[in-house]
Design a protein with these regions (language model features):
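Non-catalytic, surface beta->alpha helical segment in thiol-disulfide oxidoreductase systems
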Residues: 59-79
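Structural micro-motif
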Residues: 48-57, 67-68
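Conserved beta-strand positions in the Rossmann-like core of class I SAM-dependent methyltransferases
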Residues: 31
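Short, glycine/charged-enriched secondary-structure capping and boundary segments
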Residues: 21-23, 47, 71-73
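Short alpha-helical
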Residues: 14, 39, 65
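Local sequence-structure signature of Cys/Sec-based thiol-disulfide redox active-site neighborhoods
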Residues: 1-28
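Thioredoxin-like thiol-disulfide oxidoreductase module
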Residues: 34-50
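Alpha-helical elements of the RecA-like P-loop NTPase motor core of helicases
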Residues: 17, 42, 72
Length: 79
């Protein structure tokens, strides 16, 4: 089971919604960070200065990346 999931998200973001839906449908709790708040965005830039897209997903403080990165990461965990 996945623990310590964090999602940096913005409104009107299809892939952000997909990530949140994945975790919700699989009963995985996550902390949602609103990247439209300047202080939250600044914190994201400290954690991942190369972030250019949303969402940005962290699991156990490990940067997973965006939604397609999450799909790839989950696939490697199933193999």
């Amino acid at each position: 089971m996945l623990k310590n999931v964090e999602i940096y998200s913005k409104s009107n973001c299809l892939y952000c919604d997909k990530a949140k839906n994945y975790f919700s449908q699989n009963n995985i709790e996550y902390v949602l960070h609103d990247a439209e708040i300047p202080e939250v965005f600044d914190a994201l830039m400290i954690r991942n200065p190369y972030a250019r897209t949303m969402p940005q997903i962290f699991i156990d403080d490990e940067l997973i990346g965006g939604y397609t990165d999450l799909e790839d990461w989950l696939q490697t965990k199933q193999d």
